[in-house]
Amino acid sequence: KNKCQLPSDVGKGKASFTRYFYNEESGKCETFIYGGMGGNSNNFLTKEACCRECAQGSC
């Protein structure tokens, strides 16, 4: 699977980082809370990075 098709994944850890993931259903980059370790590659620090990688102009 392409990383943009993966679901958001909180991962492991006790941190609460706000990150962005591409939601294939809505076609948008949305926020989720990341635990700080693990997870998957559909995890971006900024909305801009998510849009550039996955949303192809829909942001």
From Swiss-Prot:
Residues 4-54 form the BPTI/Kunitz inhibitor domain. The keyword Phosphoprotein does not apply. Pfam families: Kunitz_BPTI. It is found in: Secreted. Disulfide bonds join C4-C54, C29-C50, C51-C59. The keyword Ribonucleoprotein does not apply. Negative results: has no effect on chymotrypsin and elastase. Shows weak inhibitory activity against mKv1.3/KCNA3 potassium channel (inhibits 50% of currents at 1 uM). This is Kunitz-type serine protease inhibitor LmKTT-1c. It comes from Lychas mucronatus.
